[in-house]
Amino acid sequence: MNQSKPTVNPPLWLLAELTYRCPLQCPYCSNPLDFARQDKELTTEQWIEVFRQARAMGSVQLGFSGGEPLTRKDLPELIRAARDLGFYTNLITSGIGLTESKLDAFSEAGLDHIQISFQASDEVLNAALAGNKKAFQQKLTMAKAVKARDYPMVLNFVLHRHNIDQLDKIIELCIELEADDVELATCQFYGWAFLNREGLLPTREQIARAEQVVADYRQKMAASGNLTNLLFVTPDYYEERPKGCMGGWGSIFLSVTPEGTALPCHSARQLPVAFPSVLEQSLESIWYDSFGFNRYRGYDWMPEPCRSCDEKEKDFGGCRCQAFMLTGSADNADPVCSKSPHHHKILEARREAACSDIKVSQLQFRNRTRSQLIYQTRDL
């Protein structure tokens, strides 16, 4: 009998990464660098079975993500199946490929919520970052169409050194589009963002200015009765304590990749840990019994100084993927923490950001050709 079941809660949030296909080339994409090697995708029926198992375990929220989930022709069918099972459903999209007829189909299928991402507040920078000259106008048109259909609408802007100084214009755009919520999420350095970190990490001064801009707008909007919610997420590279990543490893979040690998966070597949496939094991068995999902649960795995730290119940030892990327071992204390013996790695990144002169055009953009080239080079 599995003794861990009574103490491990079910995954409340399921993220379905339906595909790695995407019409954009954002240099901060969280998809794996080797996505070009991974062409397989779960079928409609296989995804619906994943939803059924997750719902039976107690999952309540389902996000459709990618890549770009709109590239899946069966998306309305998947939305309907999820809604019939009782999920609250959220479409996380770039808006590229979205049409008014698709919005109507999604509404009829029962979609609850839509999040549209922008790269910048102006067409020129948006095009440079997305690798698509028509993207900005398409996003504007679809954001207005989403709002016209009374969807709760979130606009998402990934902030970095090349767009963070236009934060006031970004917020003004969100107000104009009547967003319900605005995610001003400073770049999290995983996947392609980690590859481009030196050219993306804002300086400490940029972060401080951005925090003040957000504070000023919150005050101004509250005074005018504007109910748009501004969520500003700072990079933990400028913190002294790590984030409680995903609310704790294998605690509330479960992600399934396009080909069916189950993960406790978006980036965990890069770790030297075996994660099972939903095609080979049930979700229940994966969540409660698999080595991968139990590897960093609780506190027994922790090294010092985490093991004896009085803050471990807040941050759960920090991010395992970040520890792996920066130190070579996921077992190490997250270098973000000032108590970590590897904190100098974060200090080095801050110094690099302070003197970086990398232009947008010099970033490595997320596309199939670049993905193939990276791994051809690494395999030599």
UniProtKB/Swiss-Prot annotation:
One of its GO terms (molecular function) is iron ion binding. [4Fe-4S] cluster binds at C22, C26, C29. Keywords: 4Fe-4S, Iron, Iron-sulfur, Metal-binding, Oxidoreductase, PQQ biosynthesis, S-adenosyl-L-methionine. The keyword Iron applies. It comes from the Bacteria. SUPFAM superfamilies: Radical SAM enzymes. One of its GO terms (biological process) is pyrroloquinoline quinone biosynthetic process. The keyword Transport does not apply. Residues 8-223 form the Radical SAM core domain. SMART domains: Elp3. InterPro entries: 4Fe4S-binding_SPASM_dom (IPR023885), Aldolase_TIM (IPR013785), Elp3/MiaA/NifB-like_rSAM (IPR006638), MoaA_NifB_PqqE_Fe-S-bd_CS (IPR000385), PQQ_synth_PqqE_bac (IPR011843), PqqE-like (IPR017200), Radical_SAM_PqqE_MftC-like (IPR050377), rSAM (IPR007197). Binds 1 [4Fe-4S] cluster. The cluster is coordinated with 3 cysteines and an exchangeable S-adenosyl-L-methionine. Its EC number is 1.21.98.4. Pathway: Cofactor biosynthesis; pyrroloquinoline quinone biosynthesis. It catalyses: [PQQ precursor protein] + S-adenosyl-L-methionine = E-Y cross-linked-[PQQ precursor protein] + 5'-deoxyadenosine + L-methionine + H(+). Its cofactor is [4Fe-4S] cluster. Belongs to the radical SAM superfamily. PqqE family. Interacts with PqqD. The interaction is necessary for activity of PqqE. Catalyzes the cross-linking of a glutamate residue and a tyrosine residue in the PqqA protein as part of the biosynthesis of pyrroloquinoline quinone (PQQ). NCBIfam families: PQQ_syn_pqqE (TIGR02109). This is PqqA peptide cyclase. It comes from Klebsiella pneumoniae subsp. pneumoniae (strain ATCC 700721 / MGH 78578).
